[in-house]
């Protein structure tokens, strides 16, 4: 997991090093369309030169991956008082059926192996 995070960070840094406003497909209008509300979090060509690449990378990542509703710290999360969704039950049943199918497949394979060993042993 740490390796994946490092690889992602490295890719982001390499992309940032290659990012040029005139050559990229990204535009400030696209940032406004994505819903970045805070003007401090908007990327601009001069950001790379003021305060280094780290700040620019953080700003770019904040625009590209906006904060999701479920990403608040544990203290800020709302409690879920409503009953579980029907899709939860569906996935639970699907998981149970897959386990049963796997068990049945293992039984059949064991029976086939027993028959083969019995015939070889004779």
Swiss-Prot record:
Free-text tissue specificity from the UniProt record: In the organ of Corti, detected in the inner hair cell region (at protein level). Expressed in skin (at protein level).
Gene3D superfamilies referenced in this protein's UniProt entry, alphabetically: 6.10.250.1920
Transmembrane segments: none
Subcellular location: Secreted
MF annotations from Gene Ontology: corticotropin-releasing hormone receptor 1 binding; corticotropin-releasing hormone receptor 2 binding; histone deacetylase inhibitor activity; hormone activity
Pro-piece positions: 26-80
Assembly information from the UniProt record: Interacts with CRHR1 and CRHR2 (via their N-terminal extracellular domain).
Family that this chain belongs to: Belongs to the sauvagine/corticotropin-releasing factor/urotensin I family.
Protein name: Urocortin
Gene name of this polypeptide: Ucn
């Amino acid at each position: 997991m740490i390796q994946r995070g490092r690889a992602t960070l490295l890719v982001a840094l390499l992309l940032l090093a290659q990012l040029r406003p005139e050559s990229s497909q990204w535009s400030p209008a696209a940032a406004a369309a994505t819903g970045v509300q805070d003007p401090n979090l908007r990327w601009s060509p001069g950001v790379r030169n003021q305060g280094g690449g780290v700040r620019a990378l953080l700003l770019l990542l904040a625009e590209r991956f906006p904060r999701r509703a479920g990403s608040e710290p544990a203290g800020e999360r709302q409690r879920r008082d409503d009953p579980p969704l029907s899709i939860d039950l569906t996935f639970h049943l699907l998981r149970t059926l897959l386990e049963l199918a796997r068990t049945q497949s293992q039984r059949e394979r064991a029976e086939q192996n027993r028959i083969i060993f019995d015939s070889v042993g004779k």
